[in-house]
Amino acid sequence: MGGNQFRFKQFTIRQDRCAMKVGTDGTLLGAWVDVSGAEKILDIGTGTGLIALMLAQRSSQLKVDIDAVEIDINSSIQARENVERSRWSDRVKVENYSIQKYIDICQKRYDLIVSNPPFFENASKPVKKARTVARHTDFLSQADLLQAAVKLLSDTGKLAVIYPVEQAHNFQEKAEYLGLFCQRKLDVKPMPKIPTKRILMELSKKKLPLQKNTLTIEVKQYTYTPEFITLIKDFYLKY
């Protein structure tokens, strides 16, 4: 999903100044997360603003305010421009902060926090700093994200994330130690015979029975499954 811009049904993402482009991970999370009952939403590491705009579209009939924070200055400027060109500029606010700084200054408590966080920990790092920030955990570790959730979630609020399998298991263990419990989980397989590559999770402060499902993206190369199409049809132009 490269290129300088990506068009969705109700908004366009320009991304020539963003380190991380529109991808399947962010699109999946934005389409899957439960927005019902949320009035205040926080998108941590918004990048292009994709997830914030997807949630704004999904909550168009509701009174929902969305804050989006992004540490990289160029990405935050472009995300703000993407928001300003959308129909939801009155409800989505983009701020150029690290989540560590935002925790210190934020007075709100959120009903929903979402993040498509970086997950490379011990891999070689790209030369460009912006790419490093976007892809590596140095600037948004699992501990940072969980600390933000513990401090900024309301008592009934939820945290929604997407991680590769190993990191997802580690994240869930750390979350439980801090009193955040997985109540909804989606295992994502690229194709039927390929193992799970991504896990989406919703966590809350209340321990509830786990709802677990599996989503397969493609039947074969370039042929999406009906389940995936159902999930993203409100966004992808093709459907």
Swiss-Prot record:
Keywords: Cytoplasm, Methyltransferase, S-adenosyl-L-methionine, Transferase, tRNA processing
UniProt-listed Pfam families: MTS (PF05175)
GO CC annotation: cytoplasm
Enzyme Commission number(s) from the entry: 2.1.1.223
One example of a Gene Ontology biological process annotation: methylation
Chemical reaction(s) catalysed: adenosine(37) in tRNA1(Val) + S-adenosyl-L-methionine = N(6)-methyladenosine(37) in tRNA1(Val) + S-adenosyl-L-homocysteine + H(+)
Location(s) in or outside the cell: Cytoplasm
Record bears the keyword Lipid metabolism: no
Enzyme class of the recorded protein, top EC level: transferase
CDD domains: AdoMet_MTases (cd02440)
UniProt superkingdom: Bacteria
Gene3D superfamilies the UniProt entry points to: Vaccinia Virus protein VP39
A single MF term (Gene Ontology): tRNA (adenine-N6)-methyltransferase activity
Principal localisation: cytoplasm
PROSITE patterns referenced in this protein's UniProt entry, alphabetically: N6_MTASE (PS00092)
HAMAP family in alphabetical order: tRNA_methyltr_YfiC
Function according to Swiss-Prot or TrEMBL: Specifically methylates the adenine in position 37 of tRNA(1)(Val) (anticodon cmo5UAC).
Similarity section: Belongs to the methyltransferase superfamily. tRNA (adenine-N(6)-)-methyltransferase family.
Name this polypeptide is given: tRNA1(Val) (adenine(37)-N6)-methyltransferase
Species whose genome carries this gene: Trichodesmium erythraeum (strain IMS101)
